[in-house]
Amino acid sequence: MALLMFAIMRQMNIIATINKNTAFFYWLQTVSKWDTSYAFEHPLFTYYHQVIQPADNLILSQVSTIIQSDPNPYDILRKLYGGEFDDEKSRLIAHISTPLIDRFDSIWQDCNENLDVWRDVINDFSYNDLYMQLQKIAVFLGLEKQAIKDNVIFLLPPRLKVSSPAGHKISSSDFILLRPPYSFNDQKKEAVRIVMLHEYAHGLIQQSKLFQEAGRLSYETLILPKKLIAPAGYTWRSVYNELLAYCIASRTIGGYLNPQLTGKPCPTIDDMRLSFERLLAKRRPTSNQIINWASLHMLPKLTDYIEEGKLIDAAIFEPAIKVVDELRKS
């Protein structure tokens, strides 16, 4: 009986916190412009960069060079964000960037009160209705149910203008980075919660050896023979990661957790077909839109796998890769 009560009581939580050092190093890597892939957001760069003076460019160039020189640049960022200055490169970046802290202070002052409010809002969220679904996802990925653990979120400075929430989950990190929107309403709160669970899903995916095996087999079977090119700004590794994470939680297609996150059923392909076809008629969709649309096509199979307790395999990705291939031909 006691064990049953413990199982019922055991839940998970995501705790938001504010850390100026984490926010500073996120701002620093953005204005250094070391990465211009899909992760780069020009409007955010413009806002963050407004406080930079010409004399600062040498420091930014040095920071960019150090990050780019590492075989695993995101590991350097993980250490900087987490306050782990245990290697030469992270210590060097921390040292040479010290003069820029005063520049960052004006950005920090703009958003500090806003982040305080978002921290309280996020820490009021409950995840009791998601716990069992997340455990099912863990099993699907070949993980133990105990993989569903509490997580820490570091809040990052948002743009002052209208913007959408964005998150990051670096592999091997024990935290999530979240940049909330500046404004508040129920719709924004829902969007933030979805982004948080999307990034939480990335954390589970990063732990899954079965995901790596399924993605590799799918890549060797469906991508290599046709020499398919990944959507602009993405590698195929990142595409496979995003396909699965969007299937779990997405502001665009809902995902497996949509009923718990929004109280609404997941949109179907037919529900979204007309809007996507209109988009195609106007212009070429962005890489993010392509991946979301492709992900929607694998959602029914993923849902069946999860509900039936099946393990992830390469077949999960077939519907999505087929869509990407068809869009390439069109």
Indicate residue ranges for each PLM-predicted region:
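Auxiliary, metal-adjacent structural segments of Zn-dependent hydrolase domains
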Residues: 110-171
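Active-site recognition of the HExxH zinc-binding catalytic motif
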Residues: 190-211
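Pan-zinc metallopeptidase signature
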Residues: 249-253, 257-330
